[in-house]
Amino acid sequence: MRRIFLFTGLMISMLSASAQTSVETRRQYLSGHGCDDMVKWNFKCTDGQNSGKWTTIGVPSCWELQGFGTYQYGMRFYGIPKPEGIANEKGYYKYDFYLPAEWQGNQIQLVFEAVMTDAKVKINGRKAGNGLHQGGFYRFVYDVTDRIFFGKHKNTIEVEVSKESENSQVNMAERRADYWNFGGIIRPVFVVAKPVYNIDRVAIDAKMDGRFTADCFLSRGLQAGGKIKTEIVDSKGKVVASNISEVRGNDQTLVDFKVNHPSLWTAETPNLYTAVFTLQDNTGKILHRERQKFGFRTIEYRQHDGVYINGKKVIFKGVNRHSFRPESGRTLSKAKNIEDVKLIKSMNMNAVRLSHYPADPEFLEACDSLGLYVESELSGWHWAHTTIIGQQLVKEMVTRDQNHPSIIFWSNGNEGGFNYELDSEFGRWDKQNRVVLYPWANRNGFETKHYRSWGETLEYMRQPEIFMPTEFLHGLYDGGHGAGLKDYWQIMMHNPRCAGGFLWDLADEGVVRTDLNNIVDCVGNFGADGIVGPHFEKEGSYYTIKEVWSPVQVSASVQGKDIAYTLRNTYNFVNLKDCKFTYRCLELPSWGNSQVKVLKKGNLEAPHVEPGDSSVVVLKNIPASTSAVELTAVDHHGDTIMTWSTKVQPSAAVNSAVASEVSTSETVDELLVKAGERTYYYSKKNGRLEKVMVGGRTISLSNGPRFVAAKRSDRSFDQFYNHDDQDAEKKKTQYTEYVDQGAFHGMTWLDTAAGKTLRVSYDYGTLHHVDYIFQKDGSVRMQAEYDFNGVVDLMGIAFDYPESKVKSKAWVGQGPYRVWQNRLDGPQYGYWQNAYNDPIPGESWEYPEFKGYFAQVDWMQLTTEEGKIGIKAIQNASNIGVYQPRDGRDHILYELPATGISILQVIPAVRNKVNTTDLNGPSAQPYWSTSSKTVVVDLKFD
């Protein structure tokens, strides 16, 4: 034994003499750090675009996005291990590089962050490692110390990458899935130099009470008397604790000591420390120094109860997230990973599921530093890896990521892609022994079932296990996500065993097709599931989620000249006294104007409100002409939580109708009413407005007002679902219009308190009569009365106007996004305007959408090629329909009736890809109309 120690000491001395060896870990990138700074390598692709010749490619990258190979989406080959027509090209990479001469005498490791899918690596003509790595999302490391040159001696790396794995089960697990399949060296490649005697890796467990333990794994055994010095450094660089642990002659050492009063890590308070490990020999000489960031926090999974972090029950407000960008596929950069985390947090989320594979290290670093809880997943979309390959991939995932305090869960595949033999492998490598989830299954104390209806969700929450759906409210096109979230969240938060859930999903997975003139392709309804578009274009649900999941819940009550705000704290760890609140009293523009006046602004004192409690804050002495008051909450990091707008009074005063002098004339087909410079044309066949002439110009508002009503076609008007209807399945996206069976009676003039009134009367039908008072301000007050008894999803009155002539709209009401009956939260009361657009869901992303249903409207003005059409709500008229929302090309969600410009009492709810509309909760239910309604608006034409 003494001879061994003497030999070891002699070897250390020789190495020290032969090179100026740094004690720090050093890294040299052979590729770029990500998609923003790729490095050119020599490259040849065997098939598809630009194949069969040597050229260059940026590394890291997905080669399809660099113009090589064949694009492919996994679902086309779902469930088939070796299908015909699968893109199976290979890529051959070569790159020459040099390493510093002073690195000689170090251990040299070659590191690939991820290669998709099989990788065979050579360094200087010799095989690296075992010659083959399989699995496209994992870091793998080869010791190439005996294969490398230093100084002026060139090194050559060669990599053969197979897009399709030689192992069909790897393809089933990772590539026969509902996402894009790529090929290439998709994450960075670098060389690491460490002293021969080094700390290979550390596994940390730091608890809320300050106990710090770490397993330090050494590159080789060290003679007795060696030590590891551990220093805990805070974010300001101050050493707050230290410890020296003996190395007892083997290759693993346990560090165990206590740190007094550490600042704890949570998603709300992401306090990080750095552990500095210094390896010393028995003379005290420093051999190697390694650094690792971590956080002090304790996770408890309490059976039949919930998840506790640092002793407090936590609710996960989460989303599923792919590593993805349209121009670079799975290859990202540090900046883009940070951008993703900031986007998620901007919606007041606190959690993310890495669907369906481990993310870049930079993403997890951002979750650690900015604050997100993470569920990190082993690949296996609907089929699992074999045990042998799975064991290797679990090891690679867990050993790389286990020290991230943000990781709260591991998951072993997705929706049946489970290899239960791997369950114990996670604990084998994870010092913190986190729970392993099985998304879509009930296992290890968690019920995670996906896409249950609102009613089924109630049933699942009656089970004893912790309920936490790892996917819910599927967000295809403009459905799901925010639509139904408030209903779901209310029942979930009233169940003590619910731990929250994860929406599907963050962003539309649309890829730039270099083979199709650079269009952004979401593959129809497969990839267009995001809360935001491919370039993070915000859809309406973004703002709904932001409001429903706000950690400050606000309700406002206007009390004379004051507003009383009830502030409820739904944080887990933050007191509202650490937030800031500001307000603005606004005078919104009157009908047809655009100036917003700020009458008063200032700060509200942040109340002392602990998590779970509420308090009332009063804003006093609102200026008399205030239309709306905005309240903005800013969190303890300086980020805006939410801005709420409270309507104080209508922006356009509602005056009594005062008739002006009118003159009339007739043709064979029309009654003409001239009021000032405007002439109104009414059909003698049906009494409907046909057009308006303004100073010689025609404004083509026509065919109204007419009664409109529609119901989903898969049920009758008495709310009965016809199970005998074989076409019911396809009808679930269709709407049946109610046809008013009334007959036109005639037009007469009445003398009313307001003056001369034109009445258009109908017999036997739903619409009873329409009255017109032509007013002195140039507008006409229209009062329509109808009576309908039945179940409807849409109901009101409507006009036609050529959509091709519309240029823009402005309004005071909720905005700037449209609403659905089950997605009313998010848009705020204010003055809004936008130009005409007509985006195709999943194919174009121009938001906010021009068309759709708009709530709490005081007035709206359409600017057209012919002039301006104004609508001022007087009674039962605050929902304005502007044509009808467009569905995606596959018509998965709805085929709504054409209602032109409409004034609606009932607006539709929207379904999601999985659940039909009425399965999404109480707010998605149809309306049962049982009495007469009177709609009053002022119309103005300029």
Where are these regions (language model features)?
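Beta-strand/loop-rich accessory regions of lumenal/periplasmic or secreted enzymes
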Residues: 65, 114, 163, 266, ...
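Beta-strand-rich binding/interaction modules
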Residues: 121-123, 211-246, 253-255, 275, ...
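An acidic-aromatic loop/edge-strand motif
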Residues: 25, 62-65, 70, 74-79, ...
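Extended carbohydrate-recognition surfaces in non-catalytic/accessory domains of CAZymes
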Residues: 20-111, 132, 165-178, 182-185, ...
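Substrate-binding clefts and catalytic carboxylate motifs of secreted carbohydrate-active enzymes
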Residues: 33-52, 57-59, 63-66, 88, ...
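Accessory beta-strand-rich segments of carbohydrate-active enzymes
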Residues: 23-27, 44-48, 88-199, 235, ...
